[in-house]
A protein has these predicted regions:
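Nucleotidyl polymerases of mobile genetic elements and RNA viruses
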Residues: 1-178
Length: 178
């Protein structure tokens, strides 16, 4: 699954950390000063991102991203029939079904969420977007660390355009921006 993710996604990937993304932001700022370009940043986060990934949408996304059917089937079996109860001071509730969210503590969950996030970014068209900052022949308009996304562009209008595209695609798969 690691091959499916671009360099701009550092979340839960071997050899990549938040510190690296901070260094990238610092590099972008330095290059924008060097080339005398305006630079704008917008940092976004999702409300309960890992809890809101819909299972049925997740299976569809995995299929569309070319994840082999046998792997998706295994994942579906892991998530099938999940239930929970809540214990309070007055007793325990009846069991209820869980139809969204990735399994807390599972080593697969970050990978699944990264693919979910990649689907959103791809459908928002950020890979092809002209918005961003062009440094050394490369257009950079976002950096990601799991569910946290940073947009960068040369104008407020470009930032708003990127934000609105991602907001729209996120809502289609059940995620809301904070």
């Amino acid at each position: 699954m690691n091959d499916e993710l671009p360099d701009v996604q550092a979340g839960f990937r071997q050899g990549r950390r938040t510190r690296g993304q901070i260094a990238n932001i610092s590099w972008i700022i330095g290059k924008s000063k060097e080339f005398q370009k305006n630079i704008y940043f917008c940092f976004i986060d999702y409300t309960k991102a890992f809890d809101c990934a819909h299972h049925t949408k997740m299976w569809k996304i995995l299929k569309e991203m070319g994840i082999p059917d046998h792997l998706t089937c295994l994942l579906r079996n892991v998530y099938a029939g999940q239930g929970a109860t809540v214990r309070t001071g007055h007793g325990t509730t009846d069991q209820f079904q869980i139809g969204k969210g990735v399994c807390q503590g599972s080593i697969l969950s970050p990978c699944l969420f990264n693919l979910y996030s990649e689907y959103i970014i791809g459908n928002a068209g950020l890979d092809e977007a002209q918005a961003g900052i062009n440094i050394a022949g490369r257009n950079i308009n976002n950096l990601r660390c799991a569910e946290d996304i940073m947009f960068t562009a040369e104008s407020e209008e470009e930032i708003m355009s990127l934000l609105m595209k991602v907001k729209k695609e996120s809502e289609k798969v059940g995620l809301k921006l904070i």
